[in-house]
Every structure is written in C-alpha cells, then in structure tokens.
Amino acid sequence: MGEETINSTQNKTRTKTTRPKAVYLWTVSDVLKWYRRHCGEYTQYEQLFAQHDITGRALLRITDSSLQRMGVTDNRDREAIWREIVKQRLKTDIMEIRDMERLNIY
C-alpha cells in the first residue's frame, strides 16, 4: 500500500492510504514478488511462474492441475502453493464485493 500526505484547510497533515494495484493488472514481476512473499519456502518453483509468464490474471485462474502441468510435482508443495493462490483469489473477490457495495452496484 502506498501513502501520500494531504494538507487539509486547517493545516493539519493526515495520511491517505492508496489501494494496491489490482491483481488483474499484475505483471509477471508483480506475481514473482507476491510468490516470494507468500510462497518463499518453495523457491525451487519460483522460476516456473516466470517461465510460464504467469501474470496476475493468470494467477487467479491457476488450478491444482495447472500447477502440476507447470512442474510442481510434489503434492505437499503444490497444495501449499495452491492454498496461497486461493487466499489471494478470495482477497481479490472480497475487495471487488466491497467496491460494488460502496458504489451500490449489484
């Protein structure tokens, strides 16, 4: 999350939090950064995400069998990586629902 300083009319300084970039807009580099943060103990598979050009949009569509086809053959490792992907998918869904509620779009 980014932060920017805003000066109000009363010369009080407050901090406004900006939203992170939407996962759908992530580049391969963004996905690799996410991978290192959330799946850092499985470094042996990190390059598979780069080799397969996994962007944010692709990350949210990955399935267990996709991971296996990519080369994540160890069942436990694949399950752990898949769990992190599902968590990210849920976070993305929650943010979208909140946006719709905020804008009263149903």
UniProtKB/Swiss-Prot annotation:
Where found in the cell?
Cytoplasm; Membrane
Q: What is this protein called?
A: Protein aveugle
Report the InterPro entries cross-referenced here.
Aveugle-like_SAM_dom (IPR039144), SAM (IPR001660), SAM/pointed_sf (IPR013761), SAM_domain-containing_protein (IPR052268)
Kindly state the subunit structure of this protein: Interacts with the SAM domain of cnk.
User: Which UniProt key words apply to this protein?
Assistant: Cytoplasm, Membrane, Sensory transduction, Vision
**In Gene Ontology terms, what is one molecular function of this protein?**
scaffold protein binding
Other remarks on record?
Answer: 'Aveugle' means 'blind' in French.
Q: Which SUPFAM superfamilies is this protein grouped with?
A: SAM/Pointed domain (SSF47769)
**Species name:** Drosophila melanogaster (Fruit fly)
Upper classification of the organism: Eukaryota, Metazoa, Ecdysozoa, Arthropoda, Hexapoda
